[in-house]
UniProtKB/Swiss-Prot annotation:
It is an enzyme of class 4 (lyase). Monomer. It holds the Pfam family Terpene_synth. It comes from Salvia officinalis (Sage). A motif (DDXXD motif) lies at residues 345-349. The lineage of its organism: Eukaryota, Viridiplantae, Streptophyta, Embryophyta, Tracheophyta. This is 1,8-cineole synthase, chloroplastic.
Length: 591
């Protein structure tokens, strides 16, 4: 790391205006104000207040938030108390003993798999890696003629970043190697694990592609005839969304429900899962309250009534992306990013005129307080909130990591706003882009780049210039994550957005270009998601970035598919199923 880094001066956050100061926005008024920075500097700006032009402005038709500030601040949980932490420590020790017991090899693998699904494997990561390495990677303790055990081992080894070849499945293929053996169709448990394992495939792994097709075909048939209720439930969940595409904590509650119904359930594991869930929920509530206080203090939702007030949903996203318990700072930071991306997106998609949007883009490109002078009042508060936030995050990174992230973070936000402007021009021109033209811009406009850029600098222990530059140029893992995020979002929100007058999304672009039906277009987008996941899987195995940042990048894609899995807008339109999942994770304790 360069010794010159510490000499670089980062512009510190300007003091945010008090909410009452912006109550004059709707009135004809002009005033000057002086803004104090953290370091004692003074930035002088003049705000021109005038009657807002309403003609031609769109409306998002978004519902009010279900979770107001006062309600959020009232949430509290007894599970943040020390006594629960001590009880959990005792249970963790007991489960650790279960892992170390000399039991059947398959039982140990099944326990590891259960711990992951229950959301408690983080307590045993070191032990799990040691077990997988000594028992299942360097030594072959599994009968490779057993499809169930082979597929389960393959899945877990890849999930824990071990390099394992798809060739382990060759013995299950027919003599010609063109498909899997027909004799496997009655092995429902084996087919389910084969199906799950196939989603960890990289580009060019044809055996795993065959495995996916074979397992999918026969699992759909088994659903109609199998009598095992617990197994049927697992199959239905997997066919809906495979484990590799699921986020951990938002799914933990439903898996606890499924686990406690199983005849082979371990009571200690179950009790730990329930206790741990409630303890994590208590932590999440404290983080949400802090993020909500920030959101309320910005005044954005009060002064810009056309934007989505979704701070709880913004926080919910972070629970699937940044999973480690110790990264509360990063979850709160990511919540703020989500809220700012949502606000600016609504400015561009709903309220701003093209002239105003061009002015806003220029101001972001220049990145200084003076640029605010050219903006209409409603944009000034938005600009200043973003300016303050980014500079504060850069300041914290320089303080904590010794690295000046300012130019990298600025570029992420500039690229986002420039992509928004391109889409705004398409809208005003009535332009219908091809799918290729749309994707070239929309993988940026989805907002994943600021998220991953900020997280890179917070989650990388030792930041190397080479990795920062690779991030700056948007490494393939960033592109893959953002592409899945975009496509999943389009599958859920495109109809609502087009009805509001937005530009065509990927589904509509394909329909226009190929004269295809909506279902044909959606099937094509699903295939693009699958192809991009294979790229993502390859990068997860080979990337030079830290393993945790790679995992977080994949989690961003996973969270998008979780939110939009029913192909409806679970964010902007407050879908009832998403609200149920949100309550289940953040507010309703597990009894």
């Amino acid at each position: 790391m360069s010794s010159l880094i510490m000499q670089v001066v980062i512009p510190k956050p300007a003091k945010i205006f008090h909410n009452n100061l912006f109550s004059v926005i709707s009135k004809r008024h002009r005033f000057s104000t002086t803004i104090t920075t953290r370091g004692g500097r003074w930035a002088h700006c003049s705000l021109q207040m005038g009657n807002e032009i309403q003609t031609g402005r769109r409306t998002g038709g978004y519902q009010p938030t279900l979770w107001d500030f006062s309600t959020i601040q009232l949430f509290d949980s007894e599970y943040k108390e020390e006594k629960h932490l001590m009880r959990a420590a005792g249970m963790i020790a007991q489960v650790n003993m279960l892992l170390q017991e000399e039991v059947d090899s398959i039982q140990r693998l099944e326990l590891i798999d259960d711990l992951r699904r229950l959301g408690i494997s983080c307590h045993f990561d070191r032990e799990i890696v040691e077990i997988l390495n000594s028992k299942y990677y360097t030594n072959n303790e599994i009968d490779e003629s057993d499809l169930y055990s082979t597929a389960l081992r393959f899945k877990l080894l890849r999930q824990y970043d071990f390099s394992v070849s798809q060739e382990v499945f060759d013995c299950f293929k027919n003599d010609k190697g063109t498909d899997f053996k027909p004799s496997l169709v009655d092995d429902t448990r084996g087919l389910l694990q084969l199906y799950e394992a196939s989603f960890l495939s990289a580009q060019g792994e044809e055996t795993l592609h065959l495995a996916r097709d074979f397992a999918t075909k026969f699992l759909h048939k088994r659903v109609l005839v199998d009598k095992d209720i617990n197994l049927l439930s697992s199959i239905e969940r997997a066919l809906e969304l495979p484990t590799h595409w699921r986020v951990q904590m938002p799914n933990a509650r439903s898996f606890i429900d499924a686990y406690k119904r199983r005849p082979d359930m371990n009571p200690t594991v179950l009790e730990l899962a329930k206790l741990d869930f409630n303890m994590v929920q208590a932590q999440f509530q404290q983080e949400l309250k802090e993020a909500s206080r920030w959101w309320n203090s910005t005044g954005l939702v009060h002064e810009l009534p056309f934007v989505r007030d979704r701070i709880v949903e913004c926080y919910y996203w972070t629970t699937g992306v940044v999973e480690r318990r110790e990264h509360g700072y990063e979850r709160i930071m990511l919540t703020k990013i989500n809220a700012l991306v949502t606000t600016i997106d609504d400015v561009f998609d709903i309220y701003g005129t093209l002239e105003e949007l061009q002015l806003f883009t220029t101001a972001i490109q220049r990145w200084d307080i003076e640029s605010m002078k050219q903006l209409p009042p409603y944009m000034q508060i938005c600009y200043l909130a973003l300016f303050n936030f980014v500079n504060e995050m850069a300041y914290d990174t320089l303080r904590d990591k010794g690295f000046n992230s300012t130019p990298y973070l600025r570029k992420a936000w500039v690229d986002l706003v420039e992509s928004y402007l391109i889409e705004a021009k398409w809208y005003y021109m009535g332009h219908k882009p091809s799918l290729e033209e749309y994707m070239k811009n929309s993988w940026i406009s989805i907002g994943g780049i600021p998220i991953l850029s900020h997280l890179f600098f917070r989650l990388t222990d030792s930041i190397e210039e080479e990795d920062a530059e690779s991030m700056h140029k948007y490494h393939d893992i960033v592109r893959a994550s953002c592409t899945i995020l975009r496509l999943a979002d389009d599958m859920g929100t495109s109809l609502d957005e087009v009805e509001r007058g937005d530009v065509p999304k990927s589904v509509q672009c394909y329909m226009n270009e190929k004269n295809a039906s909506e279902e044909e277009a959606r099937e094509h987008v699903r295939s693009l998601i699958d192809q991009t996941w294979k790229m993502m899987n390859k990068e997860m195995m080979t990337s030079s970035f830290s393993k945790y940042f790679v995992q977080v990048s994949a989690n961003l894609a996973r969270m998008a598919q979780w939110i939009y899995q029913h192909e409806s807008d679970g964010f902007g339109m407050q879908h009832s199923l998403v609200n149920k999942m949100l309550r289940g994770l953040l507010f309703d304790r597990y009894e």
